[in-house]
């Protein structure tokens, strides 16, 4: 085979592989998608809350906040990008108190030190407008969270998902955080 024919065969093959990898990354689905209703209760143990009376209790915060707009984050661990996301969303919630915007992070882990670590994080970073909770690593089965997703973010209002963002391990970055923050107006409008 001549070099020219080899190039004509290899270049399209490489481009096809690159497209397939990109499509696979974009197709990560985790949890209910935009347009879906929340699938039901979400019982988790509250480690930190803007409502101190909730701390230490096993609650369904999705039921508690009813029809209010909520940013619900499921994560497998507290990473630097996740803490950056929490800080930015904490500021968004503070700006949108009149819309009754709420935010919940549920860490999916059975780490014995997690509850204290979440309390320490909230105190150290001055988190004021958030609920930090945890539950078993598998997460709520009826939410159908992907095992491939390290972070799943649902933005919903009136129990209906308006936006969904899912990230594999190491994929949540500043650009992803900005996309999530840009979707907050979808749920935090006054109507």
Task: Map each language-model feature to its residues.
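Short, internal strand/loop/helix patches
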Residues: 121-146
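Thiol/disulfide oxidoreductase modules built on the thioredoxin-like
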Residues: 137-177
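Bacterial N-terminal signal peptides that target proteins for export
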Residues: 1-10
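A short beta-strand-turn-helix
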Residues: 43-71, 91
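N-proximal helix/coil linker or "cap" segments that precede and/or mark the start of modular domains
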Residues: 20-48
């Amino acid at each position: 085979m001549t070099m020219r024919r080899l190039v004509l065969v290899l270049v399209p093959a490489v481009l096809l592989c690159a497209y397939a990898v990109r499509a696979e990354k974009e197709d990560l689905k985790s949890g209910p998608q935009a347009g879906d209703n929340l699938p039901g209760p979400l019982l988790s143990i509250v480690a930190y809350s803007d409502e101190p009376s909730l701390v230490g209790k096993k609650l369904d915060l999705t039921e508690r906040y009813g029809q209010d707009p909520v940013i619900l984050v499921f994560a497998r661990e507290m990473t630097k990008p996740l803490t950056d996301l929490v800080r930015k969303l904490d500021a968004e919630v503070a700006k949108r108190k009149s819309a009754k915007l709420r935010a919940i992070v549920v860490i999916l882990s059975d780490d014995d030190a997690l509850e204290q670590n979440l309390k320490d994080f909230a105190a150290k970073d001055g988190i004021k407008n958030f609920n930090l909770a945890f539950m078993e690593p598998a997460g709520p089965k009826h939410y159908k969270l992907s095992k491939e997703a390290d972070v799943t973010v649902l933005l919903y209002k009136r129990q209906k998902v308006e936006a969904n963002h899912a990230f594999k391990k190491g994929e949540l970055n500043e650009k992803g955080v900005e996309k999530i923050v840009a979707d907050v107006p979808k749920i935090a409008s006054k109507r």
